Amino acid sequence: MAGIPSALLDAEVILAHTLRKSRTYLHAHGEEPIDARRLEIANARLDLRKDRVPVAYIIGHKEFYGRTFKVNPSVLIPRPESEALIENLKKHWGEKPGKLIDVGTGSGCLGITARLELPLEVTLTDTSRHALTVAQENAKSLNADVALQQSNLLEDVTGVFDIIVANLPYVSRAWERSPETGHEPALALFADDEGLALIMRLIDQTGSHLKNQGLLILEADPAQHMAIGDYAKNRGLSQAAIDGYCLVFSKTNQST
């Protein structure tokens, strides 16, 4: 797998998954023969990795905040940096009950994790029916009681929420995709207006969907934070925190 920096690690993960063993087991039993059928499957999966298909899509899952989430090419692969949204949710909301909506949920990793970590009533939304199917399967496998709704941002959503969390597409269409991200859904990566279009639309929608003193928690490229902060300020949101890729806003007192 020339040209892939993590080739050895990726091969071990794929082989361990195929054999249904741990990587530790592989290291301890390196001389054991491999069943011909298992070897054939492993080699086919390694060929996919040579084509730069992400490991998470090959093995069908990805770890996020200590839990295993199913993924496929209809959803973005959860990133470690997105865990900061959960950490900041805990820090700025605490253990209070409330209503949270995860907009553009994809695999459901943010909303499901929030539901399992805190006493929140959670709704997952996505414009993609296929993504919602994956989120529903993850909610079921992790025993998370959540509601699901297909919606373009909050356009088809009624009611108001204490917390809106969103990892929306924020990559500029001018960005050159890596071989791996070339396999991820463009719908989950790219947005117009240098990556800001969907985030700005969601900020506009907080006026009718976010309660006073409620939180808006977003992920965005740090280079976009100033523009997002200025836009949010003009719409009644005060910046509460910046943490890596995570932005936290609080809604000031006004009519909802």
Label each residue range with its predicted role.
Residues 253-256:
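Flexible, glycine-/basic-rich loop-and-beta segments that form/coincide
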Residues 194-251:
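Conserved Class I SAM-dependent methyltransferase catalytic core
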Residues 21, 77, 129-130, 197, ...:
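Short alpha-helical
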Residues 16-88:
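Conserved AdoMet
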Residues 1-7:
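Non-catalytic nucleic-acid substrate-recognition regions in nucleic-acid-modifying enzymes
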Residues 7-11, 41, 198:
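Residue-level detector of well-ordered alpha-helical segments, enriched
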Residues 80-178, 201:
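Conserved SAM/SAH cofactor-binding pocket of Class I
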Residues 168-198:
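Mobile active-site "lid"/loop adjacent to the S-adenosyl-L-methionine
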